[in-house]
Curated annotation (Swiss-Prot):
Protein name: Putative agmatine deiminase
Gene: aguA
Keywords: Hydrolase
Source organism of this protein record: Streptococcus pneumoniae (strain Taiwan19F-14)
Pfam family, one: PAD_porph
A GO biological process held by the record: putrescine biosynthetic process
Length: 361
């Protein structure tokens, strides 16, 4: 049994620290990406090209789709033939830690498609559960096996200075680690991520089918500095959820004892929903969660990704698109803040942050 990453001197850097690269997966699952994923593939391509300006992009694509991916991307990425069940690299990829000698360690969590038999979104996730270890093997990095502890990368944020941010709604959900107490879960996070403190937000984004991942509702943008998804509409269920998160954050400090500067990032003014036109595009397998017309999607500008040279921000053809870009431009003066049309990723059930996973330098 390997010592915990914390005992070995490893920690999880912040996303805004320098990257060696980014892991992504080509979107091909018919139950996630409607109409052969054509629109999703265009969106993924724009994201990959933007990230690739400042770092290496590793793209997992199975042999059957390699020619297709190459027709979009040419030689902009490193193609790896690692099998997957879907394209959520944030949740299936490894969490890569560093130590002060610059050595890296990949943490491999158990993955059960956001809830297993209790409320998972698909039932065959065998390949997804192997992505982290297989990718770490390609990178030739040692692996810390955190299994059977169930966790997705989208469920944690790190400030790189000892503070981990999570939501209670996700980490305490019955489909993850029902046999563990909150205290045991917190201790596992601290030991596995080399951290000093876990901050538990009560909620994420309304109707988020990941049981409200933190990466859709709040994110570190600097030392003791956060953005939080927000609405002023008291009739929106999101209002009470964001308000509870804000009240907690205003009382909290980071691992070093500093109070947070909190920037409110509005959610889109117009609700993003599944339409009748979207529905014929999906092809589901047995036991897979199905979409319905009028279903509210968990749209949030907080699901941005911080690459070496750019911050990639979801856009929804909404009045708040530019507001989000302006706020994030102030948070990241040294990076290009790029809006990416993101409805076609949202239709798959996540957004830009959910399909990317940073590999620290």
């Amino acid at each position: 049994m390997m010592d915990s990453p914390k005992k070995l001197g490893y920690h999880m850097p912040a996303e805004y620290e320098p990257h060696h690269g980014t892991l992504m997966i080509w979107p091909t699952r018919p139950g996630s990406w409607p109409f052969q994923g054509k629109a999703a593939k265009r969106a993924f391509t724009q994201i990959i090209e933007t990230i690739a300006e400042g770092e290496r992009v590793y793209l997992l694509v199975e042999q059957a789709y390699l020619y297709e991916a190459q027709s979009y991307l040419g030689d902009k990425v490193v193609y790896l033939d690692i099998p997957t069940n879907d394209a959520w690299a944030r949740d299936t990829g490894p969490t890569i830690l560093v130590n002060d000698k610059g050595k890296k360690l990949a943490v491999d969590w158990a993955f059960n498609a956001w809830g297993g038999t209790y409320d998972g979104l698909y039932q065959d996730y065998e390949e997804d559960d192997q992505v982290a270890s297989r990718f770490a093997e390609v990178l030739e990095k040692p692996v810390y096996d955190a299994k059977p502890f169930v966790l997705e990368g989208g469920a944690i944020h790190s400030d790189g200075q000892g503070t981990i941010l999570v939501t209670e709604s996700c980490l305490l959900s019955p489909g993850r680690n029902p046999n563990l107490t909150k205290e045991e879960i917190e201790n596992t996070l601290l030991e596995s991520l080399g951290a000093e403190k876990v901050i538990w937000l009560p909620y994420g984004i309304y109707q988020d089918e990941t049981n409200e991942h933190v990466d859709n509702v709040a994110a570190f943008v600097g030392s003791a500095e956060l953005v939080l998804a927000w609405t002023d509409d008291e009739n929106d269920p999101q209002y009470a959820m964001s308000k509870a998160d804000l009240e907690l954050l205003e009382q909290e400090t980071d691992a070093k004892g500093c109070h947070f500067t909190i920037h409110k990032l509005p959610i889109p003014a117009v609700r993003q929903v599944v339409t009748e036109e979207d529905l014929p595009g999906y092809i589901y397998e047995e036991g897979e969660e199905e979409r319905y017309a009028g279903e509210r999607l968990a749209a949030s500008y907080v699901n941005f990704y911080i690459a070496n040279k750019a911050v990639l921000v979801p856009q929804f053809e909404d009045v708040n698109d530019q507001v989000a870009i302006d706020i994030l431009s102030k948070c990241f003066p040294d990076r290009k803040v790029v809006g990416i049309p993101a409805r076609d990723i949202l239709l798959g059930g996540g957004n830009i942050h959910c399909i990317t996973q940073q590999i620290p330098e």
